[in-house]
Amino acid sequence: PIDEVIARHVAADYRVAMLGFAPGFPYLLGLDPTLAMPRRRDPRQRVPGGSVAIGGAQTGIYPDELPGGWQLIGCTPLRLFEVAAKPPSLLGAGDRVRFRAIGEDEFRHLEAAQRR
């Protein structure tokens, strides 16, 4: 059930192993082993930016709309990569990440705050 996946995913502490695939895409270690899942056989042509996904034993976050084959489990309103920002990537290798389940109202509020 999706509620169990969410509960297990937000219970873990993650560490950014590296950034790659696309600028700002974090490969996160610390996934509950029961949530590990293979990549899709047929990758999607468009994965929305902010999508939280699982690929094998790792979690990742798509920083922008990109093609991708990881299994999508959620999304974040946070912008992970902004060319004009200093530094341009919100996360770096070694950073710790903790996910939190939020409702649609809080999602929209955080999304709007990032545009200011």
Regions found by a protein language model. Give the residues of each.
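Glycine-rich active-site loops that engage anionic ligands at enzyme catalytic sites
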Residues: 1-116
